[in-house]
Amino acid sequence: MREIVLDTETTGLDPLTGHRLVEVGAIELFNHLPTGKSYHTFINPDRDVPREAEAVHGLSSEFLKDKPRFEKIADEFLAFIGDSMLVIHNASFDVGFLNAELGFIKKPPLLYERVTDTLMLAKKRHPMGPNSLDALCKRYGIDNSKRAKHGALLDSELLADVYLELIGGRQIALTLP
């Protein structure tokens, strides 16, 4: 079974107030094993990146100004995810932004039925929390020392490890070339 673990970075917290995507990162799992295939892009949001958002992910308006707009990367992104199940931490946030961007270019939305929300899984498994990505990495002994700032691709890689722990643990001896 093919699954895509993905994360986004944005200019703010709500696409309904004009905030936009600035980065998408995704990695492919097949039968719960990383295949080594990934998708990553930065996106020009056509607006300024507020200082608060830049402090989270480190992506400035200046850095993003020559990056492609979402409509230029949408087909490639949709081809990468295909009809696979999506694994996302706090899925309503990321799917909300992705669906807003897809709506701007008249593409159909991603359906929540194809999404596994690892935040919901974590809350069921660890109801006393905390259940942030950093907290889950610490709980499961996953090295997140490279994560000085949020980054969509690195966060997807960390989330894949967390997801595998949440569903029953990693099989250390099994890896794909």
Predicted regions, residues:
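Conserved non-catalytic scaffold segment of RNase H-like nuclease domains
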Residues: M1-E113, K123-H126, A135-K149
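Glycine-rich phosphate-binding loop plus the immediately following alpha-helix
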Residues: G129
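Short, glycine/charged-rich beta-strand-loop motifs at protein surfaces that mediate ligand recognition
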Residues: R147-A152, A173
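Acidic, divalent-metal-coordinating active-site segment for phosphoryl/phosphodiester hydrolysis
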Residues: G151-L166
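Acidic two-metal-ion nuclease catalytic site recognized across multiple nuclease folds
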Residues: E165-P177
